[in-house]
Amino acid sequence: MNAENLDPATQAQTIWSDTLALIKQNSRLTAREQGWLAGVTAEAVVGTTIILDVENAQTLQVLQTELNEPIIGALEIANGGSPMFPAFKVMPPAQPEPQTTASPEDSGSRAADAQGAAKESVQPDEDSRTPRHSAEQTGDSRPAAAQEREDSAVHMARPDEQTAESHREPEHEPAQQPVTSHYDEAIVQTFEDIDPVAGFGPSVAGTTAPQYPPQSEMQGSFTPGVTGNYRDPVTHLNSNDTFDTFIQGDSNRFARTVALAVAEGSGRDYNPLCIYGGSGLGKTHLLHAIGNYAVQNQKPRPRVLYVTSEEFTNDFIESIRTSGQDNEDPAMEKFYRKYREVDVLLIDDIQFLGGKRGILEQFFHTFNSLYQANKRIVIASDVPPHNLEDFEDRLISRFEQGITVDVKPPNLETRIAILRMLAEQNHIRVPNDVLNLIAERFANNVRELEGALKRVIAMASLNHQPVTRALTERTLQDFFTTDVEVKPTDIIARVAKYFHLTFDDIVGPGRPRSVTLARQIAMYLTRDMTSMSLMNIGQIFGGRDHTTVMHACKHIADKMQEKQEIYNYVNELTVELKQHLND
């Protein structure tokens, strides 16, 4: 039935009444399972979310596991075929004051409404709810670990939308009802803070959010707000990557010391500076830190430019393609000014220039121009200069006339410090035993550490629970095996199958919403489960540039904290990939 013209509360009650009637006729549910719904009431509809009040955490657990799919299917039918997703709110215990206790008549009325709604008989169409769940994929062949992860993760079963919200002021001051591990508070978040997405309706007028207690009173509870990446349009520097945010240890102390000297301008003998090491160990961070320090601390302000080898290549090719079309300002002159009139040139992933003779020739002359002008040059690579493949000896010798430093995988103490800083940036308190657990299990690089912590934060955010060792164990139980080699083609093929697409759909130029989401998840998993650089991942995905990959990875990481279905997609695919490779 169409209830769009009703107020949010009436619309919710109408849809929920029809939903209960549909579930009542579901022959696959036992009387015991249906009994859990007797005390559930609808509070409001906001966009495509229906807020449901439940009496206790035990009921919530059943609704978000055993009854999750039947509820979503029935809600969609009751909403006229349009997706409607539940957000559950555990109601606080009744206060002892007589004036705040619901009357027996009110309770009886709710129960009567629930019982009287069971009159229609419509079977839910469970296959129409998401692009992914097929009978084959949700049957007994599904890995038990994946099912357990999904069961433990769900708090709001919404495939592509936001966390749970409330449309009214709380009845009691938050300080009187502190947040607990079961989150016995209303789940609230203002709609104004959520970016609009397709299929998501506008917020309700007058929506307000209760004031949470100060963070000092929310020991271990999650506060949204992950620090983002901001790239300066002129320098291309990420303002978040500074020496202050670079955690040093035995594995990178020398590299940081030399990098700081170059940034200060005192390390003239360190020109050029070559930083090498494996993926995800902090090379790019040091490049940005050098640039940010120089810009912020030196007078006059130096001209700084950070680029990847891919960007350098693309700029040169574009300058050749358009050269001569602008007689007053030829394209090549623009290229020369951009790269040869800077005071500090920072170039990342230099190894990808190997074998590109024309590009290397241009870089050779750019290097000489800057070096002869006593300008600073810093390059980063995955190998030391003498191991660069398909580079001319004359260029390698110029790299080696400065200083070469390496960054190694961080030790345990450094990994713990990195995790603590990441937690602070996400405004979440993480107990030391959790930091130790993650640091002990993920030892290869910083990217692994960050990925593991993000999964834990996402779980805490979705369930509105504090971060504990138990939650961390449950969240990461399928990700502690890190010695499995995953190929990007395996990831793409698995993601394509998962979303009922083809390999070519994922790597091709198509941009339908379903394909774009699958492609972004595949990019995120490739970044998370391999040591490939952003540029190399972009090449695998149809020749896309590294900024596209970077955006996709950040987008999925952010949405995992907001949208239950995105979180489930990533978790299930990770489990399936490791399960497949271990078979």
Curated annotation (Swiss-Prot):
Intracellular or extracellular location(s): Cytoplasm
UniProt region (Domain I, interacts with DnaA modulators), positions on chain: 1-91
Signal peptide start-end: none
**Keywords assigned:** ATP-binding, Cytoplasm, DNA replication, DNA-binding, Lipid-binding, Nucleotide-binding
Q: Name one GO cellular component term.
A: cytoplasm
- Gene Ontology molecular functions: ATP binding; ATP hydrolysis activity; DNA replication origin binding; lipid binding
Q: Where is this region: Domain III, AAA+ region?
A: 236-460
SUPFAM superfamilies noted in UniProt: P-loop containing nucleoside triphosphate hydrolases, TrpR-like
- Binding residues for ATP: G280, G282, K283, T284
- One short Pfam name that applies is Bac_DnaA
Where do transmembrane segments lie in this chain? none
Give the start-end ranges of region Domain IV, binds dsDNA: 461-583
Instruction: Cite the record's Basic and acidic residues compositional bias ranges.
Output: 126-135, 147-174
| Chain intervals with Polar residues compositional bias | 97-106, 205-226
Enumerate the NCBIfam families for this protein. DnaA
Q: Which family is annotated?
A: Belongs to the DnaA family.
- Fill in the subunit field for this protein: Oligomerizes as a right-handed, spiral filament on DNA at oriC.
Instruction: State what this protein does.
Output: Plays an essential role in the initiation and regulation of chromosomal replication. ATP-DnaA binds to the origin of replication (oriC) to initiate formation of the DNA replication initiation complex once per cell cycle. Binds the DnaA box (a 9 base pair repeat at the origin) and separates the double-stranded (ds)DNA. Forms a right-handed helical filament on oriC DNA; dsDNA binds to the exterior of the filament while single-stranded (ss)DNA is stabiized in the filament's interior.
Q: What is this protein called?
A: Chromosomal replication initiator protein DnaA
Q: In which organism is this protein found?
A: Bifidobacterium animalis subsp. lactis (strain AD011)
